Amino acid sequence: MVKLDEIQKRIIAEVADLHEVPMGAYNFRANGELAGRNTTENIDIQTKQDKSGIDIRIKPGTKHESVHIPVVLSASGLKETVYNDFYVGEDCDVVIVAGCGIDNCGQQDSQHDGVHRFFIEKNAKVKYVEKHYGSGDGAGKRILNPVTEDGWPHAFTPRRLTCAFLHLGCFPALSSFYLNLLSLG
């Protein structure tokens, strides 16, 4: 069961284009806590034991499946760094939808740093979608720092070194980017 309030549901709709809980694999994070998770026969999601974040493992041969891992912050002053590793097996063709939204109505800055690593096996294809959204009428900043670290040598992984400072007062702001990741094998 997914535990989100109305503000968080609105943010999820912005960053993941979800208006209801998806049928496939997902991991929803809200204000630094797990808000809901579902795995499938082919996609497993586990909480990291040594630091904040998750491991997403996609079995070889998985086709036409997706995993959604949106993050929402609606508490002013919350700052977090999350480490997510994606292990994509051989001959996969999958979609990963990530992103973070911050609704900051307070005076303190709110920040989410998402560090992603992609381990993509031979002949695998990944469509990766990530959006950032900021809203709220508080004076606190909405800071999102997505970063990609290198994965296995099979994968060409473009770096996500953008910083999204979505600090526009009460006016919402949205940034997004899309990547098609292919193994080099």
Predicted ranges, named:
Residues 2-4, 16:
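C-terminal functional modules
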Residues 24-30, 34-185:
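Conserved beta-strand/loop scaffold segments within soluble protein domains that form the structured core
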Residues 14-15, 57:
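Residues that form generic nucleotide/phosphate-binding pockets
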